[in-house]
Amino acid sequence: MRKYRIIISGGGTGGHIFPAISIANTFKKRFPDAEILFVGAEDRMEMDKVPAAGYKIVGLPVSGFDRAHLMNNVKVMVRLAKSLRLARKTIREFKPDIAVGVGGYASGPTLWMAASQGVPALIQEQNSYAGVTNKLLAKKASKICVAYEGMEKFFPADKIVITGNPVRQDLEEALSKKEEALAFFGLSPEKKTILVVGGSLGARTINRSIQGDLDKFFASDVQVIWQTGRYYYSDASKHLKAYRGMPVWCSDFITRMDYAYSAADLVISRAGASSISELCLLGKPVVLVPSPNVAEDHQTKNALALVHKDAAVMIADKDAEKDLVPTALKIVHDDERLCTLSRNIETLAQRHSADRIVDEIVKIIDKK
């Protein structure tokens, strides 16, 4: 059997990293002798998460463009030039059969240099609205794996394959663990539970909304699992000292998302593509608060794709501190509404996405 060599590039947030690791794990399960190398951004969370998953990673000194302060981009361009050189060196030394881009800062220079050296490239576009980098890379890609219909307005139709977004493999059996999950968080099976997640780094508006309205949760006999993200945990934990003994579990990062989803009757979340894919797979009712701080406002577009099918409720970031908690509490006590949202979001699930993407990778390599 042929020994495949693959580069997977991208990261920056859990929404890019966990699908990338899922693709790698699926490939290794099918082809145990495969050599897989990750290429990420040197100061981002992939530099920790990827080695923890058992894979080697090279860090590029790449960073995003500052659209608000154009003069700051001189340093960005210098870092980009260094990243292109390191990406070229990495590709020459590793000699991959294919380069797979999953989004994030490192994906652009890696796939660009791979294509310039005759290495086939595959893009995994997670969002319903393609970013500038992937639109540029599309010309050089052999295939583009997407999660939403209608992506031919961004990419050549003959290159598009609808695969869905891979999810963390520990979520596969999440719904069968509710009693075990509630015990893990020290919560009661007699109360409704709301899971609050703002992404691996955190979401300021969501955290402020929860912090400001904690009394409303407890007055409504609702318990909370709250992931603050790395940047907001210190402030939240200080605030919670006034609520000792109340049914709230709080941490900067949830290591057992299978338990968190299983315990939750309702989820409050940003509208990143990876989170939405997980929610669809598990049929979890959700109130989405799209981040306004993303390229092309793509999270709002992701959320609206669900809202238009009555598969989620959306609160604009600017309205969250006023409306988020009252809306969530109204929904969590309405079993009929919970059932409708759950049923509708589950119909949008794309299952076995990592396997489909691996199929496309193998087809491209075997054509060489």
Swiss-Prot record:
Pathway: Cell wall biogenesis; peptidoglycan biosynthesis. Signal peptide: none annotated. The keyword Cell cycle applies. Its EC number is 2.4.1.227. Pfam families: Glyco_tran_28_C, Glyco_transf_28. GO terms for cellular component: plasma membrane. InterPro entries: GlcNAc_MurG, Glyco_trans_28_C, GlycoTrans_28_N. It comes from the Bacteria. It is found in: Cell inner membrane. Keywords: Cell cycle, Cell division, Cell inner membrane, Cell membrane, Cell shape, Cell wall biogenesis/degradation, Glycosyltransferase, Membrane, Peptidoglycan synthesis, Transferase. The keyword Cell wall biogenesis/degradation applies. Transmembrane segments: none annotated. SUPFAM superfamilies: UDP-Glycosyltransferase/glycogen phosphorylase. GO terms for biological process: carbohydrate metabolic process; cell division; cell wall organization; lipid glycosylation; peptidoglycan biosynthetic process; regulation of cell shape. It is an enzyme of class 2 (transferase). It is a peripheral membrane protein. One of its GO terms (molecular function) is UDP-N-acetyl-D-glucosamine:N-acetylmuramoyl-L-alanyl-D-glutamyl-meso-2,6-diaminopimelyl-D-alanyl-D-alanine-diphosphoundecaprenol 4-beta-N-acetylglucosaminlytransferase activity. UDP-N-acetyl-alpha-D-glucosamine binds at residues 13-15, 127, 168, 200, 254, 299. It catalyses: di-trans,octa-cis-undecaprenyl diphospho-N-acetyl-alpha-D-muramoyl-L-alanyl-D-glutamyl-meso-2,6-diaminopimeloyl-D-alanyl-D-alanine + UDP-N-acetyl-alpha-D-glucosamine = di-trans,octa-cis-undecaprenyl diphospho-[N-acetyl-alpha-D-glucosaminyl-(1->4)]-N-acetyl-alpha-D-muramoyl-L-alanyl-D-glutamyl-meso-2,6-diaminopimeloyl-D-alanyl-D-alanine + UDP + H(+). Cell wall formation. Catalyzes the transfer of a GlcNAc subunit on undecaprenyl-pyrophosphoryl-MurNAc-pentapeptide (lipid intermediate I) to form undecaprenyl-pyrophosphoryl-MurNAc-(pentapeptide)GlcNAc (lipid intermediate II). HAMAP family: MurG. Belongs to the glycosyltransferase 28 family. MurG subfamily. This is UDP-N-acetylglucosamine--N-acetylmuramyl-(pentapeptide) pyrophosphoryl-undecaprenol N-acetylglucosamine transferase. It comes from Parabacteroides distasonis (strain ATCC 8503 / DSM 20701 / CIP 104284 / JCM 5825 / NCTC 11152).
